């Protein structure tokens, strides 16, 4: 008798920027998660630092990290009844140091976090741990944005028999810089997929914010490097894919 393998249904969300308003960001997250509940989504990925917004200003980074100390528990309360695993980015504080982290939330509880190994934001401490997690028979880990420029963090995840690497991104940049990274961001994800033999899924912000722009690089890439799903540039949206356990 042939045994049917279970699949991990993931959703990657491309969003407009929301700055310094955890309640409004929470509204956007809850709206997507309620949809995910109806669609049988196992895991929903949001962009880097989405909860309070990304920045390269050190004072703003530390301020947002301080606010996150209460914003993350508040978000957990709001999503406690939702089945889908939530992965959302925020600057956060630990032992007086600021990290750029992806927070993994299940049933209203923080079950883990990954802190960016190659932070390019001033005053942010590099993470040194590479945890993996199991959902629906698929082991996965997280890298964050600039980590995709480096093979090491992805390999640390793959070496733990992970099948999937999540990449929260935030490509909200000055227009000339955004233009340079428009193709490079996706190329990096393809490189990491081929290098590790893992599925790769990314979630990015999009649109404009002041004098900044992000085209959006929200995509799902096979271990062979084929892009099988992508949200159109400069549009909010979500794409869904079923990742096999092996």
Indicate residue ranges for each PLM-predicted region:
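Cys-nucleophile CN-hydrolase/nitrilase-fold catalytic domain and related Cys-dependent amidase chemistry
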Residues: 22-107, 172-198
């Amino acid at each position: 008798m042939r045994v049917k393998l279970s699949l991990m249904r993931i959703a990657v969300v491309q969003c407009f920027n929301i700055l310094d308003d955890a309640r409004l960001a929470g509204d956007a997250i809850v709206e997507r998660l309620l949809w995910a509940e109806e669609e049988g989504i196992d895991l929903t990925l949001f962009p880097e630092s989405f909860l309070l917004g990304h920045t390269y200003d050190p004072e703003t980074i530390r301020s947002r990290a301080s606010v996150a100390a209460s914003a993350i528990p508040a978000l957990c309360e709001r999503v406690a009844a939702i089945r889908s695993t939530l992965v959302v980015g925020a600057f956060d504080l630990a032992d007086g140091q600021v990290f750029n982290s992806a927070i993994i939330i299940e049933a209203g509880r923080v079950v883990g976090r990954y802190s960016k190994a190659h932070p390019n934001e001033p005053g942010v401490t590099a993470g040194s741990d590479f945890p993996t997690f199991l959902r629906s028979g698929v082991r996965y880990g997280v890298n964050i944005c600039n980590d995709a420029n480096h093979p090491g963090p992805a390999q640390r995840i793959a070496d733990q028999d992970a099948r999937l690497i999540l990449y929260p991104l935030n490509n909200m940049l000055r227009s000339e810089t955004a233009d340079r990274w428009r193709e490079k961001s996706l190329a990096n994800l393809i490189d990491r997929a081929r290098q590790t033999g893992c599925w790769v899924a990314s979630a990015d912000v999009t649109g404009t914010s002041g004098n900044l722009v992000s085209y959006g690089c929200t995509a799902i890439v096979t271990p062979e490097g084929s892009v099988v799903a992508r949200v159109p540039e400069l549009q909010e949206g979500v794409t869904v894919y079923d990742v096999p356990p092996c």
